[in-house]
Amino acid sequence: MKDSENKGASSPDMEPSYGGGLFDMVKGGAGRLFSNLKDNLKDTLKDTSSRVIQSVTSYTKGDLDFTYVTSRIIVMSFPLDNVDIGFRNQVDDIRSFLDSRHLDHYTVYNLSPKSYRTAKFHSRVSECSWPIRQAPSLHNLFAVCRNMYNWLLQNPKNVCVVHCLDGRAASSILVGAMFIFCNLYSTPGPAIRLLYAKRPGIGLSPSHRRYLGYMCDLLADKPYRPHFKPLTIKSITVSPIPFFNKQRNGCRPYCDVLIGETKIYSTCTDFERMKEYRVQDGKIFIPLNITVQGDVVVSMYHLRSTIGSRLQAKVTNTQIFQLQFHTGFIPLDTTVLKFTKPELDACDVPEKYPQLFQVTLDVELQPHDKVIDLTPPWEHYCTKDVNPSILFSSHQEHQDTLALGGQAPIDIPPDNPRHYGQSGFFASLCWQDQKSEKSFCEEDHAALVNQESEQSDDELLTLSSPHGNANGDKPHGVKKPSKKQQEPAAPPPPEDVDLLGLEGSAMSNSFSPPAAPPTNSELLSDLFGGGGAAGPTQAGQSGVEDVFHPSGPASTQSTPRRSATSTSASPTLRVGEGATFDPFGAPSKPSGQDLLGSFLNTSSASSDPFLQPTRSPSPTVHASSTPAVNIQPDVSGGWDWHAKPGGFGMGSKSAATSPTGSSHGTPTHQSKPQTLDPFADLGTLGSSSFASKPTTPTGLGGGFPPLSSPQKASPQPMGGGWQQGGAYNWQQPQPKPQPSMPHSSPQNRPNYNVSFSAMPGGQNERGKGSSNLEGKQKAADFEDLLSGQGFNAHKDKKGPRTIAEMRKEEMAKEMDPEKLKILEWIEGKERNIRALLSTMHTVLWAGETKWKPVGMADLVTPEQVKKVYRKAVLVVHPDKATGQPYEQYAKMIFMELNDAWSEFENQGQKPLY
């Protein structure tokens, strides 16, 4: 009861406080809620306002298509008068911007056919109305440039604002012509480079560049004045046939001729009556016989009809090409005008134009001038006092602009600027590089002729700069030929230094210049007594040559330096005079040529081993069927030891391999023993090829290692001299067995031509001397032994053995080698895209490095085939080889791949497995 009473007593006291706290909480929460809403709203409005302000600021500053080419020449796109969302240049924005910077000091030149209210720009708008997709008339171009110059001359604060529909081609040709008019540049190249740098993507067509060249002629130091003789265009010839029909094998062309914007002649007739030209026709010939004068435009179109009945069919046309020129710049004796593809306008789809596409006009100039009503603006124009600084606000800006025009990349050589942007018939025109001075005369804006504007074409070539040449030319550049003349001069030969005391007689100082810088092998060859230019068999030469002598004496130049197959009557080792070692210097005995004469003969010139060695010329080389003994050093690092010392009575390795045969370093000589049996070793040849051989003073037990078996040589000091590790001197008290040779010969047979490294070195420098001899001897080994039994040592390949080989031989006599190579490539792989792609690296032309060979494992799925095929097309596409010597070859490869891909698609693009 007490607890309940206490509960009842406490409840009334708690209810008021509980209710007040609840309302207080709701009140405070609502206050915080509205406060948060208010703060969030203020932040949102503030953020929105700041973003709007920022967007307006960025729009007025950065979103306008507005470019200062110079501080006084401005280029922009067309200012739109009405509100168009997404259009960058609004008239009001442009006016606000110009008024804020150039109030009352700007004039707008509208080059487009569209117009707007000129009051928006304070009625300072010149309507030029240049034609669309054409170069402006030369008359109008010159007049606008002169008007701009007059406006800039009136006040240093005046600026010119130029615009067309997109601010690209038409505006760029006017600004470029203005640079030439003010003598800033004398050729079109630097002007166009400056425009590309300031406003990328200007898209000047060949006709635009041609007209800039006309401006250079008109304003040269000796200005060219166009003649007024009418031109008769007799016919137009187009070859080869472009591919504009649906079958991509021809077109149905017609031709329009315009003077300015006025069409004066057209060959378009009824669709059914017009001739359709095919590829097999070779060329398009259309007679015209029309006389023109001034700015001439020749356009050719392809006429096609949509599918449907005659009443429902709709005839449309597609432009094939367009060309424009001024008749006043054609030389008087011209009869043919040729335009190649780079000199034609509107050639936007390269796949539709075959290689070597060109247009030829058969023309004739009339002998008399035609009377014109309007005097050209360049007539009686004084070329004085025209200063290019009028285009800039400061001298520094002038210099920076010149540098910018000269530093842009160059695509066309600047050596002949007079033919810049012209076709071949302008060859006789004089495009001067000299600056000319001109004076100005006031002209009203009403003198401008109204013509249509021009839209930008595709961006074409960047052009060369004469300023770049002027800056790059150095007066000392002519000294380069003299440097080249000094390079091949041989350095003075080193003096003869007898460091080891091996020679006592004076040496000849006349040396021939070495063919290559001396190598280690050449230096070491002198240590063995052979010069770098000495003959392979210098039997008459006794003694050891200088250690550091890089080349042989002049008296030994009559013999070839290296001879793998030449023989000599005295095949002696050049360490001494004898092929075998005789410590007592017994005179050598010349022997006749026999089966083993090259191994057993000694030097024909005997010498005393204990006397000072003397030099003698090379002996006479006699022909023999056996290879010569040669220790001539190999420049690649090996030594050619073409005879086995073991056969001469010294075991497998004799002391003749060392530069000094005695312990005192005296050059000793060997001679053939008097009782040597020449056939003593024949019985042990088969069993001793790879066996360990003891080194005995006699050669009866010596064997012959394989030809290409490298023998490791390690120098060992022997009383002031050195000796190979595996070879033993006759003075050694006890023999030492030789380690077995590694088997590297392809056949197990005796070899009489030993080749091993005589000096320690890298592994790749040992045993290389026999490589060039080995291949020559394998072809006819044992031919003399087996020929009597009806065997041939090698295959006699005198002619083709199969009908296919005979057919190929006949085809090679008449067919183009490139086509023959393509036929060999596709043989057995016709229309097999996988096989062709995996072997395409075998037929690519020399110098092609983009293509990486692919295997059949990379061509399993259709997706892989498609990916590799696209890469192959990018490599061999004919358009990328335009003008290259392999252009036709790339086209043949592309056609084979294209046919194979079509077959692959027709078969459903099946996977490999």
UniProtKB/Swiss-Prot annotation:
The modification Phosphoserine is found at S112, S453, S456, S563, S570. Keywords: Acetylation, Chaperone, Cytoplasmic vesicle, Disease variant, Hydrolase, Neurodegeneration, Parkinson disease, Parkinsonism, Phosphoprotein, Protein phosphatase, Repeat, SH3-binding. Forms a complex composed of HSPA8, CLTC and DNAJC6. Interacts with HSPA8/HSC70 in an ATP-dependent manner; this interaction stimulates the HSPA8's ATPase activity. Interacts with CLTC; this interaction produces a local change in heavy-chain contacts, creating a detectable global distortion of the clathrin coat. Interacts with AP2A2. Interacts with DNM1(GTP-bound form); this interaction allows clathrin-coated vesicle (CCV) formation at the plasma membrane. The active site is at C164 (phosphocysteine intermediate). Pfam families: PTEN_C2 (PF10409). Residues 228-366 form the C2 tensin-type domain. Phosphorylation at Ser-570 modulates its ability to bind CLTC and therefore the synaptic vesicle endocytosis (SVE). Residues 849-913 form the J domain. GO terms for biological process: clathrin coat disassembly; clathrin-dependent endocytosis; intracellular transport; regulation of clathrin coat assembly; regulation of clathrin-dependent endocytosis; synaptic vesicle recycling; synaptic vesicle uncoating. Residues 506-523, 599-629 have a biased composition (Polar residues). Expressed in various brain regions, including cerebellum, corpus callosum, cortex, striatum, brainstem, pons, putamen, spinal cord and substantia nigra. Very low expression in non-neural tissues such as leukocytes, liver, adipose tissue, skeletal muscle and bone marrow. Changing R870G: In PARK19B; patient fibroblasts show decreased levels of the protein. It is found in: Cytoplasmic vesicle, Clathrin-coated vesicle. Residues 451-776 are annotated as: Disordered. A motif (SH3-binding) lies at residues 409-417. Residues 55-222 form the Phosphatase tensin-type domain. It comes from Homo sapiens (Human). Residues 36-47 are annotated as: 3 X 4 AA approximate tandem repeats. Residues 554-572, 654-669 have a biased composition (Low complexity). Signal peptide: none annotated. The gene is DNAJC6. The keyword Repeat applies. This is Auxilin.
